[in-house]
Design a protein with these regions (language model features):
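Conserved functional acidic sites
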Residues: 23-280
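Bacterial N-terminal signal peptides
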Residues: 8-18
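Positively charged n-region of N-terminal signal peptides that target proteins for export
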Residues: 1-4
Length: 280
């Protein structure tokens, strides 16, 4: 969910966090993360060298246009708030143009819950970098990590905070909406699909639905309510990259990581550089 429209609505975000789980607002306990970069949650597995391509449409202010997102699990890690997080590299294309290149930092605790520890999203206009205003890093500037996927998701679980970054108006929440759903995407048809509902309390009428299946992860994204962006995506391809492709991804992701120390020096300078899990 884009945050530019809600960055000034932090008062509403504060109200939302007042009722958030203590685990999501009090900071991480590194002792609960003995092997954080190994993410094997059944509903959200992130194996290094895996690339997911989702395609569909979205309205980014120019009407509904072709939209494609490429999520790549790198073999890099970065220490965030005392936890060694796995680095993902995301590329967001709208109307055929690259609009955003992003590093995200995820970790799995010993119970199997997957956490979001921060994001460095570069924005581009006509191929030129314009900045990364929505950057947030857990443990810095009041930001706190949030939950991406529960260890044991089921209907009736209380909603959970996906991250808390008041400086940019980020306070997205999620809840398990349905289980046992059947959903067909270009890759194949899946049964026993888990559906989550996501929203920002500052935009209570705008919701995003995400569909997950065991052993794969996110296979579909849909919009609900008054979500003006109307992002709709389906899983188009899952790729297990060769050693050469993984090496290229590593180099490109490290370029973003190095550039972040200049583009968002106020936050990023407090973090150590990303590094490979093993020697390249």
């Amino acid at each position: 969910m884009r945050r530019d429209a809600v960055a000034t609505a932090c008062a509403a975000c504060v109200l939302a966090v007042a009722g958030a789980p203590a685990a999501a607002t009090a900071g991480l306990d590194p002792a609960r993360f003995s092997d954080p970069a190994t993410i094997d949650n059944a509903w959200f597995p992130l194996a290094p060298g895996t690339q997911f391509t989702l395609a569909g449409s979205a309205n980014r202010g120019e009407g509904q246009r072709r939209h494609r997102v490429v999520f790549t699990v790198t073999d890099l890690t970065k220490i965030i708030d005392g936890v060694r997080a796995l680095v993902l590299w995301d590329r967001d294309y709208n109307g055929g143009r690259l609009e955003e290149g992003e590093l995200t930092f995820h970790a799995q605790d010993d119970a199997g819950t997957v956490w979001n520890l921060g994001e460095y999203p570069e924005e581009y206009e006509h191929g030129r970098l314009t900045g990364a205003p929505d950057t947030w890093i857990a443990g810095l500037s009041r930001a706190r990590a949030g939950i991406l996927m529960l260890a044991d998701p089921h209907v009736g679980t209380p909603s959970y905070l996906q991250g808390w970054a008041p400086d940019i108006g980020f306070a997205d929440r999620a809840r398990v909406l349905r289980t046992g759903v059947r959903s067909c995407v270009p890759v194949r048809c899946y049964g026993d699909v888990l559906v989550t509902d996501e929203w920002n309390p500052a935009e209570p009428g705008a919701h995003q639905r995400k569909f997950y299946t065991r052993g794969v992860g996110n296979i579909r994204v849909g919009a609900a309510g008054h979500d003006t962006e109307g992002e709709v995506l389906v899983l188009e391809r899952v790729r297990h990259m060769s050693a050469g492709a993984r090496s290229w991804v590593r180099k490109e992701a490290l370029k973003l990581d190095r550039r972040a120390y200049r583009v968002k020096a106020d936050l990023y300078r407090h973090t150590p550089p990303a590094e490979p899990m093993t020697a390249p």
